[in-house]
Amino acid sequence: MELVKETIRRVIQIIFGTFIFDCPGLNKIRNVIYRFMFMSYGKKNIVSKKVMFYVPHGAKKAKINIGDLVRISEDVTIDCTSDITISDNVWISEHTHIMNHEHIICGKEWKKSKNIKTTSGLELQEDCWIGAGTLILPQVTQIGKGAIVGAGSVVTKNIDDYEIVAGNPARHIGYRE
């Protein structure tokens, strides 16, 4: 049953994630659909085309909470295997992937869908900015308030409040003043 629900959820996202619903007025329809899909969905959010919130491998859907004034650019993929909180004024730039699970491999044989390890969830705190092409890996549970992640970064650990990181793996560059 979960697989059927996830398939329906993905089809709805594909339909309402097309460029047609980026037109003024029609993008409000997309926001109404998202209000039904998530635990909470704030006001004045902009979610661009080709954004996919998905639950892989038939896992149970987690709680997704999205604050106010959130901007998610096109072609962003968010794995919803664990709870996700996107706080107010968060910007997620295009081509970003947020992963919330990994596969455990023990021995020579394994089944991808049965060896899933989920994380404790991810919180993107207020006013953080995730640069284009960023990959956030499952062990990350927090991107701090006001943090900036440079474009093309691979985030492998938590980021402090107002910290600026970039690179592969993402390394400390400095702090916002």
Descriptions of predicted regions:
Residues 129, 148, 153-154:
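A generic "structured core" feature
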Residues 157:
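Short helix N-cap motif at coil->helix boundaries in the Bergerat
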